[in-house]
Amino acid sequence: MLIVLLIAASVFLFEGDMPAAQVDAKYSNAESKFLIMENGARVHYRDQGQEGGMPVVLVHGAMASLHTWEPWVEILGQRYRVITLDLPAHGLTGAVPSGEYGAEAFTQTIDAVANEVGLDTFVLGGNSMGGGATWRYALEHPQRVTAMVLVDSVPPASWQGESEDSESRRSGPVAFSLLRQGWFRAIAGALDPAPLIGQGLRAAYNDSPVVTEALVDRYYELIMRDGTRAAILGRTDSYSNADTKMPDLSVLTQPTLVIWGAQDSVIPVSAAAAFETALPNVRTVIFDDLGHIPMEEDPQRTAAEVVSFLEAL
């Protein structure tokens, strides 16, 4: 019976991929650049702001893209050089030939972009999954990361049982819960994700007015880009099978700014306190009225904290 229902759902809600060229034309711009990694991955990145300024590399979260940082690029770019990138399975990078979408692939992608733009050292920051990619990269390449900015960051897997609360799990994006279910992953590659995207964005952005039709369309069309849905499932499987051993974040002595929205429905604000305990050189800023994507919900206030942090380095 379950198999019949899965087949019926796949047929009724089926939606084919969008051509990559069509999506790329809409969501690239004059600042967009592409590099080809040794593993064949074509990585989309942008190098903006002040050419001679302190370099700041920013990494987006799950289901997002480098576009999430554009409000900060506009502000930080007045003083700093700001590099943003699309991770594998996301944005205009999308599916990669190797089919590798785990934490190590993210580390390699960040490293490749940093090398491509000629950075020896840089400030590294990330939101949500990109925050996890940030501290993982710093653990592997501590000599390259001069400071970190963690924005509602994914914590180590071994913390999650301590930091999750039932209310946030109920009110967060439904798609994240469904992607943990094997039955859903079996059909998700063919389903039209439109209803889940709308609900997920409203939850993640704390019902912010920045969730416009254009923003919903961008998320939808980037996810529907040829091969990306299958790549997202590959990323989900990679993280489901990830090593859950406890990393020693105390070795990360770089100055670190932790920013959190207290209304985060994806990763509860209690995780900010856990980072504050684990990291030896940390400053924490909590925004009581913001959610999981504070850099888009209120770019001016959040970027001001980043500028203050960077000025003190």
Predicted segments with their positions:
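Acidic catalytic loop of the alpha/beta-hydrolase fold
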Residues: 263-267
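Flexible "cap/lid" loop of the alpha/beta hydrolase fold
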Residues: 139, 149-185
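Conserved alpha/beta-hydrolase catalytic His-Asp/Glu region
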Residues: 23, 160-165, 185-251
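Alpha/beta-hydrolase fold catalytic core
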Residues: 1-54, 79-80, 119-120, 311-313
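Active-site loop/oxyanion-hole signature of alpha/beta-hydrolase fold enzymes
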Residues: 36-40, 46-50, 87-125, 129, ...
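Catalytic active-site module of serine/aspartate enzymes centered on a nucleophile-bearing elbow/loop
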Residues: 282-313
